[in-house]
Design a protein with these regions (language model features):
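Mature extracytoplasmic/periplasmic domains
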Residues: 33, 187-190, 219-292, 328
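Glycine-centered hinge/linker elements that transmit conformational signals in sensory
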Residues: 132-164
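Periplasmic-binding protein-like
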Residues: 198-221
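Hinge/lid segment of periplasmic solute-binding proteins
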Residues: 19-68, 80, 85-89, 97, ...
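Early extracytoplasmic/lumenal segment of secretory-pathway proteins
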Residues: 1-25, 39-42, 172
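Conserved C-terminal helix/tail region of periplasmic/extracytoplasmic solute-binding proteins
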Residues: 280-329
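Extracytoplasmic/periplasmic solute-binding protein
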Residues: 60-64, 69, 88-137, 144, ...
């Protein structure tokens, strides 16, 4: 995206580019992408996909794929479909394997993989305005954030989560049949299937009292603000917004379409299941303030899980640090 942002003002950049939606805020701020009207096709896309291509009330591209993490179950070990975190742990323990549930964290933390659990405590990363768009006002403070931090500490004390569990360790443990459940995305599910595992993709169970909403990423086509082929670009965008084009991209890319009706017709059960999880997920913020969040957020989660910081005080310090970073720009 840096190269695109540099090239567009000179007139040398491409007419179209494909990137994740979380680049949208920066691209609009730099004036390098043009609005794109989805027209009547707008209603065919998942709400989360439409939100993804919308910034300050304008749509800026055509979404084509949605992606999120989900709960993945080893069907050889259990056929339970837990709706709460505690039920999942209890179910996993009955299998007798080393890990009732495993999730990657690493020494820098992993807010992305843990976000579904965090939202179940009513602690989304940012507040939203009346139109449902994110503001730069943090929503992770208050009782919801404290409750999530306290839960993190309890799971760390219980040995369920740990900064010592990296992505590779979690993946290998699941591949080796040492874990009943994990939270991961389609990239690892493909590897599980290639290894011959029988798995199912399920909604993430709630650890708190609300629904678990993992982050949803959306892949989209953008149009350069300096494009000289606007008529051809419009025709191409109109085609990309048809079910036919969406179905072809889904087959080629192996990712759930941004159109639920297209994903529902797939003969790939994983695509169908990930699509359903994404539909009820939370769009990953595309606002510039998001760049100030990750480092403090992840480090604090890891420290709380391993007992290096007290939950309430550590979380409050994190919120203060993030707010200061956002204010300093």
């Amino acid at each position: 995206d840096t190269e695109f942002t540099t090239q567009v003002p000179t007139g040398n950049g491409p007419d179209l580019i494909v990137m994740a939606h979380d680049k949208l805020g920066a691209l609009v701020a730099n004036g390098v992408v043009a609005p794109v009207d989805l027209g009547e096709a707008k209603s065919n896309f998942a709400d989360v996909a439409v939100k993804a291509v919308t910034y300050n009330g304008q749509t800026y591209g055509v979404p084509y794929a949605v992606e999120s993490v989900a709960l993945v179950r080893n069907n050889a070990l259990t056929k339970d479909t837990p709706t709460t975190y505690d039920d999942m742990i209890a179910s996993g323990k009955t299998t007798g394997v080393q890990y009732p549930f495993i999730i990657q964290m690493g020494d820098k933390g992993d807010p992305y993989h843990f976000y579904g659990f965090q939202t179940s405590f009513g602690a989304p990363v940012f507040n939203t305005n009346a139109d449902g768009e994110y503001t730069s006002e943090l929503a992770m403070g208050g009782s919801g954030g404290t409750d999530f931090a306290t839960w993190l500490k309890a799971q760390g004390d219980a040995g369920v989560i740990s900064p010592s569990i990296t992505g590779d360790i979690a993946k290998q443990a699941f591949l080796d049949g040492k874990a009943a459940y994990t939270v991961t995305g389609p990239w690892n599910v493909a590897a599980f299937r290639e290894a011959g595992l029988d798995v199912s993709v399920l909604p993430i169970p709630s650890a708190g009292s609300q629904a678990a909403q993992p982050f949803v990423g959306v892949q989209m086509f953008y149009q350069s603000a300096q494009s000289t082929n606007t008529l051809i670009a419009k025709q191409f965008f109109n085609y990309l917004a048809t079910p036919d084009a969406q179905e072809k991209m889904q087959k080629l890319g192996g990712r759930a379409s941004a159109m639920p009706s297209v994903a529902d017709k797939s003969d790939d059960q994983d695509i169908k299941d990930f699509s359903k999880v994404a539909e009820s997920g939370a769009l990953a913020p595309a606002i510039p303030a998001m760049g100030k969040v990750w480092s403090f957020w992840g480090t604090t989660e890891a420290n709380i899980a391993k007992g290096a910081e007290e939950p309430e005080a550590g979380w409050a310090t994190m919120v203060t640090n993030i707010n200061n970073a956002i204010a300093s720009k």
